[in-house]
Regions:
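N-terminal pro-sequences and low-complexity stem/linker regions of secreted or lumenal proteins
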Residues: 24-368
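Secretory targeting and sorting signals
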Residues: 1-25
Length: 368
């Protein structure tokens, strides 16, 4: 995310044995019969900027919160962007390489496995033994898709499952006119368990596929993971195409796509929408919640502190009472364990940390 960090952090890669990352089992709170989860990640904005009185995002901060619940104490897990996305789907903490957004798309060279399935070593693309919630869903005969805006806009790159060659530079660190896709906002392509199989081309697709998939419950994936482009997620401001970017463009994106999700039969029956941010602005907030989190590959997950800052999240669901607020501390690991609970899955990595609270009755507060 921040190129200046490349000169401040040195990526060390050590050789060793392939690890086996295991899922953890811990008591699960009562979870309603959620069968369709939609996750939308926006970029680099603090809680106060997004949800304060002067927010430039009225759809998110006012209209959408009125339809669901505001998680006022939701935190990112690190800086910079990529480590948070990887956290959300795998429970793996940051490496030195992911803390600088993997400007070089290198393999993660593993030296072993630590507590809670944390893979020891450094690099970007995890060995096939390291699993994600996508792998868990597939194993349970459930479905998933990553919807990546602009992934198919390059004239020379694949239209789906797009990523650099192993060992090569990432050409998507900066937006290009007509192509504002960012590899680092697509966590699925950082796992060999996905990119080395036909699953990737089938399931890591363009955002335009979402409309057709929402048409029927049977075509709506159990997990729909949505990443806007570098303008519509609020990362860039202004954008290369002249749009304002920031929260203004992010809010417009939500105003276009969220009503489609909320109107779908799958959502109305048993859906859960989560809108959050990958991290707060780096340098302004590196705070964390939810107790100490062991991250053996880096000293500070937030570079300057223990986390990625307070960002907030909005939850909308038939199982959530509109217009409510929860001040229970949550973070991206808690989001992962909550999604796994909904689908009856074990907890991967740090999503299985003892004492971490997954979504409970404070979130699922509406009787149906």
């Amino acid at each position: 995310m921040r190129r200046l960090l490349l000169s401040l952090l040195v990526i060390g890669v050590a050789g060793g044995l392939l690890p086996m990352a295991t899922a953890q089992a811990k008591p699960k709170p009562a979870t309603p019969a959620i069968r369709h989860i939609f996750v939308i990640n926006l970029e680099n904005t603090s809680y106060d900027e997004t949800f304060g009185a002067a927010s430039p995002a009225p759809y998110l901060s006012k209209e959408l919160t009125a339809k669901g619940q505001l998680l006022s104490q939701y935190f990112a897990t690190g800086h910079v962007s990529l480590s948070n996305y990887i956290t959300q789907i795998s429970g793996q903490g940051p490496s030195k390489a992911t803390q600088v957004d993997c400007a070089t798309y290198s393999d993660f060279v593993a030296t072993g496995t630590g507590d809670l399935g944390q893979v020891l070593g450094d690099g970007c693309v995890y060995p096939a033994s390291v699993k994600t919630i996508a792998d868990q869903l597939t194993a349970k005969h459930l479905t998933w898709r990553g919807y990546m805006e602009d992934i198919g806009n390059s004239a020379t790159e694949p239209k789906t499952c797009r990523h650099p060659a192993i060992g090569g530079p990432d050409p998507t660190l900066a937006a290009r006119p007509g192509d504002m896709y960012a590899t680092r906002h697509n966590p699925f392509v950082y796992f060999h368990s996905i990119i080395d199989t036909p699953t990737c081309a089938k399931n890591v697709v363009g955002l335009d596929a979402l409309t057709a998939d929402l048409a029927k419950p049977k075509t709506t994936r159990n997990l729909s993971y949505i990443a806007p482009n570098l303008c519509h997620d609020g990362h860039d401001h202004p954008c290369v195409d002249g749009q304002p970017g920031g929260l203004v463009s992010a809010d417009a994106f939500l105003g276009e796509w969220v009503p489609k999700i909320l109107a779908s039969k799958a959502f109305k029956k048993d859906g859960l929408l989560v809108v959050t941010f990958d991290e707060s602005e780096i340098g302004a907030d590196s705070s964390d919640c939810c107790g100490p989190t062991p991250t053996p590959n880096v000293e500070q997950p937030g570079i300057q502190g223990p986390g990625g800052g307070r960002v907030g999240a909005v939850i909308v669901s038939p199982f959530v009472k509109p217009g409510t607020t929860s001040d229970t501390p949550y973070n991206h690991y808690a989001l992962l364990c909550s999604m796994e609970d909904a689908f009856g899955l074990s907890h991967l990595g740090l999503a299985g940390r003892p004492g971490l609270q997954c979504f409970g009755n404070d979130v699922y507060n509406k009787k149906t």
